[in-house]
């Protein structure tokens, strides 16, 4: 049976607790849009799923920010000179793993986080754009106005 390192267990427990109890407001990623019509209907069949996905993404970003901060700002833990159940190469592997984790945390902070937030922003902007064009598209379909429909779809694409 393979033993799981205590540090891995501690980090996993920390991330689980952080993501379970840390709540980031959904308003950070999505602004609620109120409809002016009096009907109680949803424009998006997956509106609740979208809200849940955005909320989960917000929790993920928060957890990754905290984790990367800890990795970058905490010193290396060294077990050099300690024999760990016959695993003589384990201390050097731990040091290398810490260096790799720190490099990944820097990559998260400098590249990945921005790409993720840009993607989430793009999704929200498209959703808003779609909601703004929805009534016009439905009306164009119902009246058979092909030109308006083409223009609306073209606007959504660009």
From Swiss-Prot:
Residue ranges of coiled coil: none
GO terms for cellular component: plasma membrane
SUPFAM superfamilies to which the protein is assigned, alphabetical: Bacterial hemolysins (SSF58100)
Main subcellular localisation: membrane
Annotated transmembrane regions: 120-140
Assigned keywords, A-Z: Cell membrane, Membrane, Signal, Transmembrane, Transmembrane helix
Signal peptide: 1-22
One Pfam entry name: Bacillus_HBL
Keyword match Nucleotide-binding: no
Keyword Transmembrane: yes
Subcellular location: Cell membrane
Entries under PANTHER family matching the protein: NON-HEMOLYTIC ENTEROTOXIN LYTIC COMPONENT L1, PTHR38443
Protein name: Uncharacterized protein in hblA 3'region
Source organism (scientific name): Bacillus cereus
Taxonomic lineage: Bacteria, Bacillati, Bacillota, Bacilli, Bacillales
């Amino acid at each position: 049976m393979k033993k799981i390192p205590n540090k891995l267990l501690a980090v996993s427990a920390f991330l689980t607790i952080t993501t379970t109890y840390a709540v980031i407001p959904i308003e950070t990623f999505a602004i609620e849009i109120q409809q002016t019509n009096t009907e109680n209907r949803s424009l998006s069949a997956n509106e609740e799923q979208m809200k849940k996905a955005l909320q989960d993404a917000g929790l993920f970003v928060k957890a990754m920010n905290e984790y990367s901060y800890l990795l970058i700002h905490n010193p290396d833990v060294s077990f050099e000179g300690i024999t760990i159940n016959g695993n003589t190469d384990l201390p050097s592997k731990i040091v290398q793993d810490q260096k790799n984790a720190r490099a990944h945390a820097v990559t998260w902070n400098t590249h990945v986080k921005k790409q993720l937030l840009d993607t989430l922003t793009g999704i929200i902007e498209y959703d808003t754009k779609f909601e703004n064009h929805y009534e016009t598209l439905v009306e164009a379909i119902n009246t058979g106005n092909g030109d308006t429909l083409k223009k609306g779809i073209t606007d959504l694409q660009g």
